[in-house]
Curated annotation (Swiss-Prot):
Signal sequence bounds: none
Homology family: Belongs to the anaerobic G-3-P dehydrogenase subunit B family.
Pfam family of the protein (one): FAD_binding_2
Keyword hit for Isomerase: no
Cofactor names: FMN
Lineage: Bacteria, Pseudomonadati, Pseudomonadota, Gammaproteobacteria, Enterobacterales
Protein name, per record: Anaerobic glycerol-3-phosphate dehydrogenase subunit B
Subunit comment: Composed of a catalytic GlpA/B dimer and of membrane bound GlpC.
Amino acid sequence: MRYDVVIIGGGLAGLTCGIRLAEQGKRCAIVSAGQNALHFSSGALDLLSHLPDGQPVSQPLEALDELARQAPHHPYSRMGAAAVAALLPQVEALLERSTISLLGSYQQNHWRMTPLGKFRACWLSPVDGVTRGLPDSRFGDNPLIAGIEGFLDFQSRIVAGTLQAQGIAARSDDLKLPVLDRLRQNPSEFRAVNIARVLDRPENRAALVEELSLLANGNDAIIMPACLGLDSPEVVGELAEALGKPISLLPTLPPSVLGLRLHQALSQRFRQLGGMVMPGDRAVRASLSAQEIAVHSHHHRDIPLRAKYAVLASGSFFSNGLVTQFDRVTEPVFGLDVRFAEQREGWSQQDVFVPQPYMQFGAIVDEHLHPRIGGETIGNLYAIGAVLEGFDPIAQGCGAGVSLLSALHVAEQILKEGNL
């Protein structure tokens, strides 16, 4: 099987890179081992919320020079501030072409509400998310935090309590919704995605409107768990129109409706452009030459995927893009050079709430995001997303930005080289 580009990993980075290449007529295949981190995400995208020294960032572009000084191995520092600034409008345009509706701008961070009622700096948020600092922020002065009886993946009382501590007159109550009784009988099935599949049905809309109308009497807005709008995001707007007050959604424990919705939109866009996705398969090894890369997958061991270029978007430890042994960290498909602390005790901190050193382990790359094998740079291989070294996606609030920007950075280079 021959393609222009083979991408290993079907998460945010892999799909974004594939979409950009496919838009320009490149034949792309994505080998995807299974559920990716988007299934566990809030659906919001961060760019840069903190510098490595902990200093908060409100205007990400203004912080790139200082980031390069503090973290020269950070992917943004590798790509360069000028490249990052040039790619950001392209990222937002690509998401819009993928029919993903988001609020925010790379010029200025805003605040999104977390599932515990706190606020975190953010670049782009779902249009039905709970935000502050945007013209469309609308969670009200005395919102109702509406939980669902028996649903353990969202705690409305905790959210209301956190907001009350911030001076917001929030209160909580639970929806009974007998239409969900069948799901309640099996707690393992009483999850956000399954609830959304029930509540999104038109025949169940009237019951939901009736209960919310009663519970929210006297409240100027409603905040619900993200158990709506899985396949039809407009459901939330229709519900708000029926009630006459804004409705916003908060992420739940995984699987996440908002994250899954983002993944579905990107996957659909890639396939519509002619891209090939091989779900449930796993790249196990590869052979390299200057003219071609052959990727062998678990299900197609004897029929390699051949391409002039390969892009590694396999993620970090979470998705086995990086693998730990007792004394080392390795990249399992190509055997890339990986930067990690030589002493095992330097991998982590005892306090789980402080930045962990292992989060910054990853593949060593140059400014073009070419990785190395045995110290030698591989010119037709690229690495993008969470497999890269030099950044902490949690402490620095930059995981989505690294995935999106590195993906487009590499796609543009492949397109330029392919047109020479």
